[in-house]
A protein has these predicted regions:
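Extended, non-transmembrane interaction/recognition domains
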Residues: 255, 271, 297-303, 318-320
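Residue-level detector of alpha-helical recognition elements and their boundaries
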Residues: 68-69, 304, 316
Length: 333
């Protein structure tokens, strides 16, 4: 392992991001659409400070940033660096902010200046303030419409989805973010150069990337799904995902299993049974047996348990099913 340099070059993160773009261009050029080709081409023509600012924003969470918080010696004036990004449409210099977005970008002291009436509830948390204001502030508007901020602006990155797609192709997943790779010169993360043949690429066609992103959207939606809303729309979205690659089909099966568990927590047995039936994820058959039992379909549960006994998928399934069989046999008569 190469020792980390105590004083990396000022634009080390930009250099590494550009290395990532070059790597993607060499290996995935045939999967890029016109927008992605244009991004890679135009990024290279931007002033260094503008390229660095965009990478800095991509390394951080979210898409909205206070310009006053984007202070980097090597970049200089944030608004000057942002101007070419604004010209390309990659950054919105005056995005409409919901109340939630405004709260996420503001301290309690700043919120008190914007909403003086909150002083009567100074001891409450920001979350409490948000709930107080939400019923009467449901219109999104730019920062200067919320309050006069002559010395500050909000900048919104508008190419986040495109860059997430590039990040997915680079890492092969969405768990890792750009900060991991671009910080490698600090010794925080180390990567070896490994040659990858085209046949060994994680994504063989553009549809594979589309499928991964669609599955990720479904997973994110499941985690945030309202308790009182049926899963019908989510199930339709999952059905629409074309998983041509076996490893993508496995991800879909895992998500269907998670959906089945969510349905069980709601005691929505029929929806749970449907999700488990369509999932090949380990444990799905055992969960189907349990759900059939909860539905009062003892004969069907017993038949599936006996079928499982003809070829267990794992020792864990064998133990679970064999514990269930005596009870199912008694209940089925």
């Amino acid at each position: 392992m190469t020792p980390a340099s105590p004083t990396p070059p000022a634009f080390y993160y930009l250099t590494n991001f550009e290395r990532a773009l070059a790597w993607l261009g060499e290996r995935y050029d045939d999967l890029f659409d016109a927008h992605e080709h244009a991004f890679v081409r135009q990024f290279a023509t931007l002033p260094q400070a503008s390229r660095a600012l965009l990478v800095r924003m991509l390394m951080r969470n979210g898409s909205d940033f206070r310009a006053s918080k984007l202070v980097y010696d090597e970049i200089g004036c944030t608004l000057d660096a942002a101007a070419p990004l604004v010209a390309l449409g990659w950054v919105d210099p005056a995005p409409a902010l919901t109340l939630d977005a405004l709260f996420a970008l503001s301290t309690k002291a700043e919120l008190l200046r914007i909403f003086p009436a909150l002083a009567a509830h100074a001891g409450e948390r920001k979350a409490d303030w948000l709930e107080r204001l939400r019923p009467t502030h449901d219109v999104a508007q730019p920062l200067d419409a919320w309050c006069a901020q002559p010395d500050d602006r909000v900048l919104r990155v508008t190419v986040g989805a495109l860059c997430d797609r590039l990040r997915l192709m680079f890492f092969g997943n969405l768990h890792q973010d750009w900060s991991e790779f671009v910080l490698s010169d600090l010794g925080v993360f180390q990567y070896e150069s490994v040659p990858i043949a085209p046949s060994s690429r994680a994504f063989q066609q553009r549809g594979d990337v589309d499928a991964y992103l669609a599955l990720q959207m479904c997973r994110d939606a499941l985690e945030a799904w309202p308790d009182d809303r049926p899963f019908d729309d989510l199930i339709r979205a999952l059905d629409a995902v074309d998983c041509a690659q076996p490893w993508l089909a496995t991800r879909r099966a895992k998500l269907l299993f998670a959906l089945g568990q969510a349905c069980e927590r709601r005691a929505d047995w029929y929806a749970a049974l449907d999700a488990y039936t369509r999932s090949a994820w380990p444990g799905s058959r055992h969960r189907r047996i349990r759900v059939l039992e909860r539905c009062g379909r003892d004969d069907d549960a017993l038949a599936l348990a006996l079928d499982a006994r003809g070829g267990f998928e794992s020792d864990e399934e064998r133990q679970r099913v064999e514990r269930m069989l005596p009870r199912l046999q008694r209940r089925a008569g």
